[in-house]
Amino acid sequence: MGRLVQAFKFKPFSRKQKKILTWWLPESQVHEMNGIIADGAIRSGKTVSMALSFVMWSMETFSGENFGMAGKTIGAFRRNVLKPLKLILFARGYRFKDHRADNLLEVSRNGVTNYYYIFGGKDERSQDLVQGITLAGFFFDEVALMPESFVNQATARCSVEGSKWWFNCNPDKPKHWFKVNWIDQAAEKNLIYLHFTMDDNLSLSETIKERYRRQFVGVFFKRFIQGLWVAAEGLVHPQFADKAKAYAISSVSYTHLTLP
């Protein structure tokens, strides 16, 4: 399992995070849905709650099954998802073995053991990595950064009865394949859809949230802060057009300029 030198400090879960963590429970009215999509702003608390929910669901529902987890690259997934996830699992009484050579996480608790294969979905060739394997579920982190062929191949591998999908991402352009084929068709695919903002992450202080709000403008504000699927076309920085005089340079004195 390896030595964990830092303890995970739990913060209160927000209402939407609690939905992510509990939608699959038998007493939930939506537990028979095929999966869940969480999109929205950066730093909004999607990733950790989605990853934890995925493992909790799989450990409560199956034993001895294979599951898939993916980021754009394996390195990014290990850094952004697996590192904090392992701390949380350890704190909640799970035990695990990380077989790094095989990119396999073996998780055990109360006599139940399941196996989680880690994939990178960085290009069209990535679909070959998941061919042939039979899975009981798949978790996609930053799915909008992956090619559609990889996601189609990975979801098709989930043929075990009761298998489900977890997707989370930050938004991209409105015609992005995941927006068009999955979010816009969530009802038809029998998927839960939740939209997140920074206010859904109770671990962020108002000071930090305000700093992020001031950091981005234009299309980047709409995507990163509001979590909207907007196109980077036309006025990327509309504040310049709205206040042209404030940014205009009326005159420049070239007399005092020193050329190299």
Predicted regions mapped to residue ranges:
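Conserved beta-strand scaffold positions in the cores of enzyme catalytic domains, especially
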Residues: 69, 118, 193-195
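ATPase catalytic-site recognition across NTP-hydrolyzing enzymes
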Residues: 201-257
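Walker B catalytic acidic pair
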Residues: 142
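Residue-level preference for the first positions of well-ordered beta-strands
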Residues: 35-37, 66-68, 116, 137, ...
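Pre-P-loop entry segment of helicase/translocase ATPase cores
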Residues: 1-34
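Conserved P-loop
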Residues: 35-100
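ASCE P-loop NTPase helicase motor core
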Residues: 137, 145-215
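Inter-Walker segment of RecA-like/P-loop motor cores
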Residues: 83-133
